[in-house]
Each structure stands twice: as C-alpha cells, then as structure tokens.
Amino acid sequence: MTQFIRKDFQVDEPDKTAVIRHDAPAPRPWEPSGILYLIGLPGSGKSAVAAGLARELGCPARTLPLDDPDAALEHIFADGPAVVEVPYKLLLGEVFRQRLQSTGRVLYLMASVEAMAQRLATTPEEQEKARERLGRLRTAYEPLIMQTLQLMAPADAPLDEVLADVLERVRM
C-alpha cells in the first residue's frame, strides 16, 4: 500500500484560499481551436494518419504549405477543428514552433529510420540512400521536434495500429 506524506503548512496569508473543483474539467490550451498538428520526418505516416484521424474525428485534414504557412494557419483557424500535417522544415523557426504549441496539440509520429526508408523507397538501393538521408534529418530535426511535441506516438507499426494508438492518445 502506498504511504502518503502529509505535511502541515502554515500560510503567511491566511485570507487567501484555493478552490479545487472536481465537477468541471480543467481547461486545456488546445480545446478552443480544436487543432491537432502532426509532426514527423518524411515517411513517418503523417499524411495517412492525418487522413484517418480526420475521418474518425469528423474534421478536415490539412497540410501546411512551406510558403506562407502563417496565412494558411489563419485560414485553418477560421474553418474550425482540423488535423494539420506540418512539414518538418517548418520546425526550424522557434516562433512558429511556439505558435503550434499555443494554438493546438502537437503530436510527433516517431518512426524508425528503417521503417521510414521502407515506406519511401521501392528498391534496396533507394532504401540505403533514404536511410542515410533520414538519419541526417533525424540528427538535425529531432531536437526541434522534441522541443515542440506535446504528444508522441510510435509509428513503425501498420497504419491501422498506428491510427488506433494515435486516436487513443488524442482522446485522452
């Protein structure tokens, strides 16, 4: 059995009180916008998962363009809830990463280099080149991704398993 530590704290300001409500859910920063951002490297399954999530959640799937993503975000906000695929190159800007975090939930689809290479290439030679390129991308972008994410889901499994896992995480 777990033993809880109980301490008596003397408050210097006895007129101040805190009210903890159990009848109302705690506010969550992403609820007003209803935006779920999917981030990950090429081949992690962002497009496929975005389409599946959009279908399951009853909202559109969008992809941010590399040119003028801020304007695209404004249109997305105006349209309401959406699942938004974010190209990894957009994560270079710190202000943009902060904007993602403050306007929705950011979910990282974390796939192995091997799985991403298999999805992107059709021949063994292409897979080797893809593995090398993806390894370099992971080294460069994963620190930025880790600074940005709020949720993370493994993405090596088949699409239906990844989608089920992501849905469970999103609905928490």
Model regions: which residues?
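Short glycine-rich anion-binding loops that position phosphate/pyrophosphate groups of nucleotides
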Residues: 88-91, 112-114, 158
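Small-molecule kinase domains that catalyze NTP-dependent phosphoryl transfer to phosphate-bearing small molecules
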Residues: 126-165
